[in-house]
Amino acid sequence: MQEIKSPDGFIPLDIFVSSIGKERHTDKVEGMPGEVNYGTSYTSRDVELTMWFNAKDTIDYRLLRDELYAYFDSYDYLYVIETNKPTRALKIVIDNSFRDKRITTRVGEITINARTVDNPFWVSLYTTKELNDTGYDALVEKYGLVDSINSDNTKYKFTERNFSIWNAGNVTIEPETMYLKITATGTNGVLEIRNKTTGDTFKVSAEFGGDLVIDGMNTKLNGVNVFRDTNKRYTRLVSGKNEFEIIGQFTDITIDFRFYYK
């Protein structure tokens, strides 16, 4: 995520974020009263951005207004961060038109209605690899008190066969739609990764060895796609502690992901 400064003359005021919307899935069965409930799936959040702008004169006011319109039209999506919660971001899109509200000849206010895209969750700006490499104290110094991190569980790179990792978010990490990268070095091409907490097991049995990288739904061994040599299953990470067992030859294994929050 790259920080993008707002145009000169504009002062961001606030961000208002709704709860996550849900879509309920039901079906009607002939001869039965009511509907069959199949549960819900998350949709998106509504996000409202407010800002002021202060121009030099009435001509400059119009130029600033047009500059802001062009600014928000230049990006397909943006990440927004609350100043008082600087560790997490929301990915948003702005599809609806908006207009300024003129307060004086030089001062105006704009309210922009946006919504989340890809997933509706707050996501940590840092990854667990950064937490592992820099340590908890360095992360606190950079971001402040952060995100339910367990100070006793900040290790995400292991040489042991049995270990546990901590998902500080309150959302289960799903590799289909969220960032999760597992790297195992020094394998002989045959490896089994078990998350004993979720019951998920990933297996690969290739004809050559090397460094194994499972990046979301992509599996490569020494840069070669080996998806067909796997059991085509992936590992989720529930909120809190996840107990792992590794079976097979490896040098070290790193579990890199971001924390997600409702």
Predicted segment positions?
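Charged, amphipathic alpha-helical segments
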Residues: 28-31, 59-66, 177
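Oligomerization/assembly interface segments of phage tail-like spikes and tubes
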Residues: 34-59, 106-120, 242
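Short beta-strand and beta-hairpin "edge-sheet" elements
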Residues: 77-122
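Solvent-exposed edge beta-strands and adjacent loop segments
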Residues: 1-44, 89-100
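Short, charged, solvent-exposed linker or helix-capping segments at domain edges/interfaces
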Residues: 122-130
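Intrinsically disordered, low-complexity segments enriched in serine, threonine, and glycine
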Residues: 129-262
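Compositionally biased, low-complexity regions
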Residues: 41-79, 88
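Beta-strand elements of well-folded, non-transmembrane domains
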Residues: 51-55, 98, 116-120, 186-188, ...
